[in-house]
Amino acid sequence: MIGCIKTRLRRFLGDETGSAVLPFALWTPLIVGIALSTIEVGALTIRTTQLERSLDETVRTIRLNTDVAYTHEQLKTMICEGTSLLVGCEDTLRLEMVSLDMRDWVDPASRPDCVDTTFQQVTPQRAFSQGIAHEMMLLRACYMYTAFSPASYLANALPSDDQGYTAIIATAAFVHEPSSGGF
């Protein structure tokens, strides 16, 4: 009886059929996770680059058109028109423009003003001032987006709110040039 069990056990341990299934089962989740994270990094890079570029172009327009006092909605529209891949840009982009006093420095708020995705209709505007000639201004844009693949390792590592939105923040500082009309 014991000899029969030993023989069967030896035969089972010596059999190599199906041995490729184990490495496949162990490595596949890792490789798929890395592939999804690579796609997520690419999508994040494209979104960040588009937001930064559009914000820079908008700041350039503000600096060159010194006689115009742009509103929050006008600047948001200008930024969103300068991007093509920021899905729902008008709804999930929030701008914050504050003046910076170089002689009596006070740090701007460490947390950017972002859209509250739980109550999109009731998000108050925290800080948006036009500024005057020769004044240093900080313009911060916060775009909220959902991850391309929530199952990727990167999407799990990025900070997100309760609805699964992650923030991309772009910042630009500029000085209002003197204008003939002033604002």
Stretches with model-predicted labels:
Residues 3, 56-183:
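Short, conserved structural patches
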